[in-house]
Amino acid sequence: MVSRKAFIDKANQECFSFNIQIPWWTYNNFKSLVWRKRLSEEQVYQIFLSLCREVEDRQMQAVADKRKYQTGFYVAACNGREFRFEFAFKKNQELSVYNLFETVNGRKKLTLMDLLDYIMD
């Protein structure tokens, strides 16, 4: 488990060299996970630190391949919940996180809105 201060110290030591943009809907997903007590703030920092490490690795691969790198990966929280991040690099070293959702057995966990959309279709 990583506290906020430890996360910031580690990020400063490792010098993550990219900007991260998280759209408001993904940010709201983060906030709702904390509000619903599914994750503590420390667990969110832990997941975000894992994201940063993974991004750093993917960025090195993208630079080596000289192409836009688009990918996703899974992170397991300490309480057993699993999440999937999907992100894409832009040419100006900017990272865009465009998806974050909870998974069950590798598949997206259905929410009430997903069920309503499915019924409406």
Give residue ranges: language-model regions.
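Ribonuclease/tRNase effector modules and their secretory precursors
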Residues: 1-121
